[in-house]
Amino acid sequence: MALNDFHVSEPYTLGIELEMQVINPPGYDLSQDSSTLIDAVKPQLTAGEIKHDITESMLEMATGVCRDIDQAAAQLSAMQHVILQAASEHHLGICGGGTHPFQKWQRQEVCDNERYQRTLENFGYLIQQATVFGQHVHVGCANGDDAIYLLHGLSHFVPHFIALSAASPHMQGSDTRFACARLNIFSAFPDNGPMPWVSNWQEFAGLFRRLSYTTMIDSIKDLHWDIRPNPAFGTVEVRVMDTPLTLDHAINMAGLIQATAHWLLTERPFKPQEQDYLLYKFNRFQACRYGLEGVITDAYTGDRRRLADDTLRLLDNVTPSARKLGADSAIDALRLQVKKGGNEAQYMREFIADGGSLIGLVQKHCEIWAGQ
């Protein structure tokens, strides 16, 4: 299968996707009513898109192409408002978080959609288990070679993005001991983790052609890499973040990725090499398991650094770019988060430690998303 030509995009423009949980009070399990909610909301949209994801308990909010995080925030806020209004009318709740803490995958209904039904046929129960919720951020690129460079540059900071956004400590009714358990769900997929090494767009086109020989890959959407190029949109898409509990945190994460992309493409601080990925999965695991307390290891020097410390260094490096893009408020908020030493997974554990239940936790998440 031939790959689409890389669509030229305005560099550093943004697109944000948020996979939301559709909740059924008063038990606060996942609902199977996303189709009802989507049908009610679509006629009211003035910008962005609300659509299905894999199962009927998932709802995706997606912005259009945005100049900056303020425009993205305005679109997401408008969508949030109409979704919450429709959810209230249908006696449903909406919340963030990377996993639902006690849902059972066996109960999840795959959407009546040709692509998702084909994926169910290919992957079986793995698709139902993938009822997890992430934030994806697209950044515009001028050409395919820039996209490949940006993908490799952003891959250095996958642990940082995971640790900052980690919001999935519970799964199937248990504390997993992970800050981000969501990404473990994808470990059985054949395309899990980093993209196979290529050095330019021409090599990527060849890689895609060979992957399509498997008959399991019909489009870029069928590849579940942590970061992937999207030629139809002219973007690089970062896919490792848990869906945050608040819209503010989602915007902050998008601002960080936009600023990091600007820094990488203007400063070119790395010369990408295949060896960069030697310890990729080890460092990724540290972020998933321990969050900001994880320790990452340099593949070349063997130096070991706390993720919290290295994240502060990243935030300092991208601050000038953030100012140029109007994303400095996002960097300031994330810097404060790191200095306080927490993420949303830590908050969830503290809620339970203080005597809360998993049902009460989901109820609280719905209240947080609704601004209560």
UniProtKB/Swiss-Prot annotation:
EC assignment: 6.3.2.2
GO BP: modified amino acid biosynthetic process
GO MF entry, a single one: ATP binding
Enzyme class, spelled out: ligase
Catalytic activity, reaction form: L-cysteine + L-glutamate + ATP = gamma-L-glutamyl-L-cysteine + ADP + phosphate + H(+)
Keyword Transmembrane belongs to the record: no
SUPFAM superfamilies to which the protein is assigned, alphabetical: Glutamine synthetase/guanido kinase
Keywords: ATP-binding, Ligase, Nucleotide-binding
Superkingdom: Bacteria
KW ATP-binding (keyword) present: yes
Pfam families the UniProt entry points to: GCS2 (PF04107)
Gene3D superfamilies, alphabetized: 3.30.590.20
Family membership noted in the UniProt record: Belongs to the glutamate--cysteine ligase type 2 family. YbdK subfamily.
Role: ATP-dependent carboxylate-amine ligase which exhibits weak glutamate--cysteine ligase activity.
Assembly with partners or alone: Homodimer.
Name of the protein in question: Putative glutamate--cysteine ligase 2
Gene that this polypeptide is encoded by: ybdK
